[in-house]
From Swiss-Prot:
A UniProt-annotated Pfam family: RNA_pol_Rpb1_5
Residues annotated as binding Zn(2+) 2: 1002, 1075, 1082, 1085
Similarity field: Belongs to the RNA polymerase beta' chain family.
Transmembrane regions: none
Organism whose genome encodes this protein: Roseiflexus sp. (strain RS-1)
UniProt GO cellular component terms: DNA-directed RNA polymerase complex
GO biological process: DNA-templated transcription
Reaction(s) catalysed by this chain's protein: RNA(n) + a ribonucleoside 5'-triphosphate = RNA(n+1) + diphosphate
Protein name from the UniProt record: DNA-directed RNA polymerase subunit beta'
Keywords: DNA-directed RNA polymerase, Magnesium, Metal-binding, Nucleotidyltransferase, Transcription, Transferase, Zinc
Length: 1504
């Protein structure tokens, strides 16, 4: 029973080197691909047959073994195994790398997983990996301590040596000084002696000279002097004077003076000599002290330098820590300081070494957990990020070192093929070039390492190998992308996966299929609704194998080969056989773009001549097809099951209602509408008007005889009643003999013919039938015939004969569809016939210009002139002038349109086309017969110059030029809009694709209030909005209190009518928004399936339907941002598609409204040209004190007091009363016998309103507002709204806002589709405090999973986690889905896969995309039935294995325990549980198992 794709979950993880080697069939050692002479793969090369398998089926490389009989033999000569060549699509090889290489996804992804794990910044990590920096990978702590001590000892020694040197120098200096001073003293004594001797000699000389002179004078005493007599230059006696005793006395005096002067000079010289010696001594002493100081300083600086140096080097040694990044210089310096203490390395090898040696995940997780709980801010954030990665590795069983590759897998050669082109050249996959680079560099590196090449060369080669592997895995992620010939970027393995051309979107989600073709479509007016015309040539090609088999069966050919020849020669019998084969066979028709599920429908093929496919005109609306050259594709469902499914679910006649709105999508249009309109018109005064007929047959006979006109009003007596309103008089007559009602009716032959084509219950419609009327007929027909009360058993038996016995509801649905389809076909035939008979056509003369036009234009011109005059006089501003003129011309255009309308001939073809809504509208007509009006310029601003002409008159050159703006803008908008709408649809599909109806009832009590008051806002009737919902609470008659319907009753048409009659204005209904189903949605919350009009079935893919319903009309939405009045102002509102994207992406809107943050009173303030809006919340607290009789207040009424102030005291001295004291601060109020203090607490929130912002209606001074209310006009920011008003308010807001956009464009979508998407946007919660759960702060968790986990924790007495609701945009929500396959196939493929691989994510294949990707049936529709059947089979097997007596089974008695557990796990996954958790199956599990089957428990169950 276990098949290759019979699994229920798929896991992705990192591959270990052992895994890679186990996948490999051999090592690729050579870069060669194929030999260009023999065109055979080279041995050990990238296409080697020995490794990857033979290139030809059952044939080895050398040709020794050929044919299938040698299957499995390995050739002894060439080593190739004889097998099928398709193994070359699955066999892998490997390259053993000479040096480890990092995987770029884990290095360059954000956040860098390797960086987080090692706590290294991505920049530093990159520098290590690409050999720019070293990383310390090993530290010998013992050696480090020794090195530290040695260094300290060395510097201690150095310091001592320097101090000793300094001391010896000091001693030397002192000795020198003492010597110098001693020398100076002896020199001084010598100098004194010399001076004494000198002066003694001089004294003796003077004395001798005086003595000589005295003796001369004594001799000549008494004589007159012959000449002047001098003594040492002084005149003693002049010439002629007599020498006397006085002269001798004078000589003695002079001698004494001379000797005294000499003595003084001697003393002076002695002093000078002494001073000189003193100064010299001082100088010497000063110099010595200076030298001493210098020595001291030098010593100190030397010591300081040593201390500094020691400190630096000690710091360097201390900084030797694991994971430290070093530059080349730092590495060299450290190696000198601390040789042998550490080992530093670079490249991926170093990182791998580091991880293997140092990372203990359990210990690291514990440390990080402590950090998360004990720190705040940035540190906590970082610890959380790191913890997330560590936990991922711990839980998944992946090893961190596997992020570094030592063995590189080589993908199978047929996935990177090489093909020969015409000119003998070869085209090859880029991957081969990238692999070749890796192999070349790897081989070169091996050779260099063998040769012991210099480190720098080896290192460079290692870096180049790293870059080659990076380019192979993800080219262009780091540095410049590797490009091949012609500068084109080579496509790497990552590029093979991502983007529209990647594996996911190109080959897994969408494939090209066989048994298909395409051709142009033409209209098939004679086809039935469920038929299509298939060209014979096409059918023969499509059904070739079937035809060949039938030819053999019928004996036209003996074997398939000859049958093939017959078909190729197109013998006549082929066509008969083809007719037989194709009878009752369904084909699928598809028109691209497939915007919704009705773009692919099944039809019975009808063989036709020609080459074009014929399509029924009524299904064009569903396909959005027309016949102006559209093409459609045909697909053949091959298996019986596929045929059955196509017939039951996809046949066009069973897809009559639009899944988006529930209205008929099979609506007659254009010619059919025109024919029916023509047929049901009344033309008073036409031939035969007013005649009376006794019966319908009589009237028809008169028409056949040409007595009355088809549109003439006549009176006819008939049986039955008028259906709905009648636009002509009706007189009821007495019933006929069977009791059937009869009436006399004014009608026309046309209406009789028309009603004859209607089914009995839908007659008699006596009014003008336009497009809307035809739609009503189809809708009424479907409603009538799908209602079981209107059907007989015979009716149901008809369907049973076709489809076997089914639930009565299903039978009614099929019967209703059959009847509606036949009704639609009858209307189609009738419409076409009478459109032809009526001969309505259109000519230029039918476009009549109303005579009033000139007057309207003249009036407008006059008013414009007046406005211009006022502007010139300065009475109005430029802005006002522009607005006035635009308004005048808009009014003129409206009046012209009205005039065209009135002037139209109601029986003219143009009026008939417009009024019947067959084609065109009054605005187009107005442009043809009235005036074109105002145009807008390329920016969307309205040009004030109107186009006064119409197309009938023709435009002037200027008018034509002005009108081209609008035309071109329209085309550009359409092109852009289509792409945008497509992308929006894709995002919506992705966010909702796993929303499938999985269970009957989730049991929630919550729901959604729908209010009549919202009608105006969302432009839809209250009745329409509640129809098809289920009640979440009983519906009560507001007047009598009578219960009209109970909880979980469907609100059908009858109940809706009752609500309207009783004017009930609010209903509490079940809604997808409130659904609590673990996976998907429950039937009750979803309600009615709009495509069938019945309660939704289990297995319906409601998420996809919702996304298609919103995305499909996306192209109709306008792209541009509207400028109201044409001028940019505060009420610039984004509309159309950009607004829808804004809503679903939960972005901050343009022109965001300011919301009130608290409940309170509005105060509008203006400060320095700044407008501020203040919201003040006040709360009053009153503290009353009773005043006893003899107490008097000591404060005045209205006074402000503080806490503790005296309020009143006794006025009588004899009574010693305590004073009354204020218990709170506030304002005093004195009343009769009491005194109160009123305290006012104010909370104020103030916002600055932009100049352009307009206040929201009702916002003025003193207005009361609630939190979340608009203070200014504009769109609210949904994130703000979520914070202020909570989840429900934001849900309602998003649904209503999206509806506003669609309805303003006239697009109808049911609310529930938008609700399904909004539910997905609010699915996640962000963890704030993890409590005792294993969540991390900031983690995004599914809300149902969060509630379940908390309940579990509380039941065990633990502390639950806290979280806040998150509103995610659809892109973000798609990427946070539980399925990694769905997320990876959506966007950011590499990021999603990186994350999934590290966490070892398991995809339980619950959504549609993931099942399509791996090629399983989707779990929707018949796929869910298949899963249930499979589950039942497994239960059967378990029942056989499990003993019915006890749940506990002894290990030894259960040899098949593992197989049994695997079965049980698969069962759980099938019925919607996890692989590991039996609790999550919404109760279906027990229902499936029943009473008598006992399921043996898991190990973990036993522990629990």
């Amino acid at each position: 029973m276990l098949e290759i794709n019979d699994f229920s979950a798929i896991r992705i993880s990192l591959a270990s080197p052992e895994d890679i080697l186990s996948w490999s069939h051999g090592e690729v050692t050579k870069p060669e691909t194929i030999n260009y002479r023999t065109l055979k793969p080279e041995r050990d090369g990238l296409f080697c047959e020995r490794i990857f398998g033979p290139t030809k089926d059952w044939e080895c490389y050398c040709g020794k073994y050929k044919r299938v009989r040698y299957k499995g033999v390995v050739c002894d000569k060439c080593g190739v195994e004889v097998t099928r060549s398709k193994v070359r699509r699955e066999r892998m090889g490997h390259i053993s790398l000479a040096s480890p290489v990092s995987h770029i996804w884990f290095v360059k992804g954000t956040p860098s997983r390797l960086g987080l794990l090692l706590d290294i910044s991505p920049r530093n990590l990159e520098r290590v990996l690409y050999f720019a920096s070293y990383m310390i990978v090993h530290v010998d702590e013992e050696l480090k301590a020794q090195a530290r001590e040695a260094l300290q000892a060395e510097y201690r020694e150095k310091r001592e040596r320097i101090q000793q040197e300094a001391e010896s120098k000091q001693i030397e200096l002192s000795t020198q000084l003492t010597q110098d001073l001693g020398g100076m003293e002896s020199a001084q004594i010598t100098t004194q002696r010399r001076i004494e001797e000198e002066y003694r000699r001089l004294r003796d000389e003077i004395s001798a000279e005086a003595e000589r002179l005295r003796s001369d004078l004594e001799e000549k005493q008494g004589e007159a002097a012959e000449e002047d007599i001098l003594f040492r230059g002084t005149v003693l006696i002049e010439e002629g004077e007599i020498i006397t005793e006085k002269t001798l006395d004078a000589l003695d005096e002079l001698l004494d003076q001379e000797l005294e002067t000499l003595e003084q000079r001697k003393q002076r010289d002695l002093e000078d000599a002494e001073q000189l010696t003193g100064a010299e001594r001082e100088r010497k002493e000063y110099e010595a002290s200076q030298e001493r100081e210098r020595l001291q300083e030098r010593l100190q600086s030397e010591l300081d330098r040593l201390v500094r140096e020691e400190k630096e080097r000690l710091e360097q040694i201390d900084s030797i820590k694991l994971k430290r990044i070093l530059s080349e210089q730092e590495y060299r310096a450290l190696r000198e300081i601390a040789p042998g203490v550490f080992r530093a390395d670079m490249g991926a090898g170093a990182v791998r070494d580091m991880i293997v040696r140092t990372i203990d995940l359990d210990k690291l997780a514990e440390e990080l957990q402590n950090e998360v709980y004990t720190t705040q801010g940035q540190r906590r954030k970082k610890a959380t990020k790191r913890l997330r990665v560590v936990e991922a590795f711990r839980k998944s069983g992946n090893r961190p070192e596997w992020m570094i590759l030592t063995v590189l897998p080589v993908i199978p050669p047929d996935l990177r093929p090489m093909v020969q082109l015409d000119g003998g050249r070869f085209a090859t996959s880029d991957l081969n070039d990238l692999y070749r680079r890796v192999i070349n560099r790897n081989n070169r590196l091996k050779r260099l390492m063998e040769l012991n090449a210099p480190e720098i060369i080896v290192r460079n080669e290692k870096r180049m190998l790293q870059e080659a592997v990076d380019a192979l895995i993800d080219n262009g992620r780091r540095g410049r992308a590797v490009s091949g010939k012609g500068k084109h970027r080579l496509k790497s393995l990552s590029d093979m996966l991502k983007g529209k051309q990647g594996r996911f979107r190109q080959n897994l989600l969408g494939k090209r299929v066989d048994y298909s073709g395409r051709s142009v479509i033409v209209v098939g007016p004679d086809l039935k609704l469920h038929q299509c015309g298939l060209p014979k040539k096409m059918a023969l090609e499509l059904f070739k194998p079937f035809v060949m088999r039938r030819l053999v069966e019928k004996g036209f050919a003996h074997n398939i080969k000859s049958a093939k020849r017959i078909v190729e020669r197109v013998r006549p019998e082929v066509w008969d056989v083809l007719e037989e084969v194709i009878k009752d066979y369904l084909v699928l028709l598809n028109r691209a773009p497939s915007l919704h599920r009705l773009s692919i429908q099944a039809f019975e093929a009808k063989l036709i001549e020609g080459s074009a496919i014929q399509l029924h005109p009524l299904v064009c609306a569903a396909f959005n097809a027309d016949f102006d050259g559209d093409q459609m594709a045909v697909h053949v469902p091959l298996s019986r099951k596929a045929q059955e499914e196509a017939r039951m679910r996809m046949l066009s006649k069973y897809n009559l209602l639009s899944p988006a709105t529930g209205d008929p999508i099979i609506t007659p249009s254009q010619d059919i509408v025109l024919g029916c309109y023509y047929l049901t018109m009344v033309k008073d005064g036409a031939k035969g008007s007013g005649k009376m007929f006794a019966s319908i047959d009589e009237a028809l006979l008169a028409y056949d005889k040409g007595l009355i006109d088809i549109q003439a009003p006549i009176f006819v007596r008939m049986t039955g009643t008028v259906y709905g309103e009648s636009d002509r008089p009706v007189r009821m007559l007495s019933p006929d003999e069977n009791g059937a009602p009869r009436m006399l009716l004014e009608t026309t032959i046309g209406r009789i013919i028309f009603n004859n084509e209607l089914l009995e219950p839908l007659r008699f419609r006596n009014r003008l039938i336009a497009k809307k009327g035809l739609r009503e007929i189809i809708a009424d027909c479907y409603k009538y015939y799908t209602n079981l009360n209107n059907l007989t058993e015979a009716d149901l038996d008809t369907i049973r004969a076709m489809y076997g016995d089914r639930p009565r509801d299903d039978l009614a649905r099929y019967f209703g569809s059959e009847m509606t389809a036949s009704q639609a076909d009858r209307i189609k035939t009738l419409g076409f016939r009478y459109a032809t008979r009526g001969g309505m056509t259109i000519g230029v003369d039918d476009i009549e210009i109303p005579p009033k036009k000139q007057d309207i234009l003249a009036e407008a011109e006059k008013r414009v002139t007046e406005v211009e005059r006022q502007f010139r006089r300065g009475l109005i501003t430029e802005e006002e002038r522009y607005r006035e003129i635009v308004e005048i011309w808009q009014n003129a255009t409206k009046q012209t349109t009205e005039a065209v309308k009135q002037h139209l001939n109601p029986f003219g073809p143009v009026a008939m086309m417009v009024n019947s809504a067959a084609r065109g509208n009054i605005n187009q007509l107005s442009q043809m017969a009235g005036m074109r009006g105002l145009m807008s310029d390329p920016t969307g601003r309205i040009i004030e110059l109107p186009i006064k002409s119409n197309f009938r008159e023709g435009l002037s050159v200027l008018e034509y030029f002005v009108s081209t703006h609008g035309g071109r803008k329209g085309l550009a908008d359409t092109a852009l809009r289509t792409a945008d709408a497509g992308y929006l649809t894709r995002r919506l599909i992705d966010v909702a694709q796993d929303n499938i109806v999985t269970i009957d009832d989730c049991g929630t009590d919550e729901g959604l209030w729908i209010y009549r008051a919202d009608d105006r806002e969302v432009l839809q009737d209250f009745e329409q909005r509640i129809l098809g919902r289920l009640l979440a609470a009983p519906l009560v008659d507001p007047r009598t209190g009578e219960i009209l319907a109970n909880r979980n009753d469907e609100i059908d048409e009858a109940l809706v009518r009752k609500c309207k009659e009783l004017a009930i204005d609010a209903v509490y209904v079940r809604s997808p928004l409130a659904c609590k189903a673990d996976y998907g949605i429950c039937r009750m919350c979803y309600g009615r399936n709009l495509a069938t009009g019945k309660l939704v079935d289990i297995g319906e893919a409601v998420g996809i339907i919702a996304a298609q319903s919103i995305g499909e009309p996306g192209t109709q939405l306008t792209l541009r941002t509207f400028h109201t009045g044409g001028v940019a102002s505060a009420d610039d509102i984004t509309q159309g598609l950009p607004r829808v994207q804004e809503i679903f992406e939960a972005r901050t809107p343009k022109g965001k409204a300011i919301l009130a943050e608290i409940d309170g009173i509005v105060e509008l303030v203006r400060e320095d040209e700044v407008r501020k809006i203040r919201v003040v919340a006040t709360e009053l607290y009153t503290d009353d004190h009773e005043l006893p009789p003899h107490y008097e207040p000591v404060v005045a009424d209205g006074a402000q007091v503080n806490e503790g102030d005296v309020l009143a005291q006794s006025n009588r001295a004899d009574l010693n009363g305590e004073p009354i004291v204020a218990r709170i601060a506030g304002v005093v109020r004195i009343g009769a016998g009491q005194i109160s203090v009123i305290n006012e607490e104010r909370e104020v929130r103030e916002v600055v309103a932009p100049h352009t912002a307009r206040l929201a209606p009702g916002i003025e001074n003193g207005a009361r507002v609630v939190a979340g209310q608009h203070l200014t006009e504009g769109s609210a920011d949904p994130q703000e709204l979520l914070a202020l008003q909570g989840r429900e308010a934001v849900q309602r807001y998003l649904v209503n806002e999206a509806q506003k956009v669609y309805r303003s464009q006239g697009v109808d979508i049911n609310d529930k589709h938008i609700e399904v998407i909004v539910r997905q946007m609010l699915r996640r919660v962000r963890i704030e405090e993890p409590g005792d759960t294993d969540y991390l702060p900031g983690e995004l968790i599914d809300s149902t999973e969060f509630v379940r986990k908390n309940a579990e924790i509380i039941s065990q007495g633990g502390e639950p986690a806290t979280a806040s609701t998150m509103l995610l945009g659809i892109t973000k929500a798609s990427l946070t889905t539980d399925s990694f396959l769905a997320a990876a196939s959506f966007q950011e493929t590499t990021r999603v896969l990186t994350e999934a691989a590290i966490t070892g994510k398991v995809d339980y294949l619950r959504g549609l995309k993931e099942n399509v990707v791996i090629g399983k049936l989707i779990p929707a529709g018949t796929g869910i039935e298949k899963r249930r059947q499979l589950a039942e089979e497994i239960i059967g097997e378990l029942a056989n294995v499990a003993p019915a007596t006890s749940t506990a089974v002894v290990e030894q008695e259960r040899p098949d325990r593992e197989a049994d557990e695997a079965l049980r796990r698969r069962l759980r996954a099938l019925i919607g549980g996890d692989g590991d958790d039996g609790e999550r199956n919404n109760g279906d599990f027990d229902d499936q198992v029943g009473e008598d089957v006992v399921i043996p428990p898991d190990d973990d169950d036993q522990e629990a």
